[in-house]
Amino acid sequence: MATTAVTLKDVCPQEFIATYARFLKKTGRVQIPKWNDIAKTATYRELPPTNPDWIYYRIATLARKVYIRGGDGVATYRRVFGGNRRNGVRPNHFADVNGGNIRYCLKQLQNLKVIETDAVKGGRTITATGRRDLDRIAKQIYDKKNKI
């Protein structure tokens, strides 16, 4: 039976993000900030995240988004993760998330050599080693799901 090339786009996003977050936590190469347990992800949120491993999931999500979109910067990802600001009896309005969390996660991915800053266009792009690593994890998920 011939092996097929599996990329990140061939697996379920939720499965990939959960698997990559577990991988990041298990390897211990990501430094968790001191403010991890008290920081809110956005100004319009009332409470910090309930999942103590939320930073790993945000890093995994950003790695996937950089792989798929590429060339986007912090401002774009602030809008991508944004949501509705609840204004009481007044109408809701869209609000961006905090840029510090996004910036920190992107720096951690740069330290892991998964992404790099695009010198020409700005923003972040996936590196060859980052593409290889993410595709390798996607292949493991694909093989486990399609096991005969």
Curated annotation (Swiss-Prot):
It holds the Pfam family Ribosomal_S19e. Transmembrane segments: none annotated. GO terms for cellular component: cytosolic small ribosomal subunit. GO terms for biological process: ribosomal small subunit assembly; translation. InterPro entries: Ribosomal_eS19 (IPR001266), WH-like_DNA-bd_sf (IPR036388), WH_DNA-bd_sf (IPR036390). GO terms for molecular function: RNA binding; structural constituent of ribosome. Keywords: Ribonucleoprotein, Ribosomal protein. It comes from the Eukaryota. Belongs to the eukaryotic ribosomal protein eS19 family. This is Small ribosomal subunit protein eS19. It comes from Dictyostelium discoideum (Social amoeba).
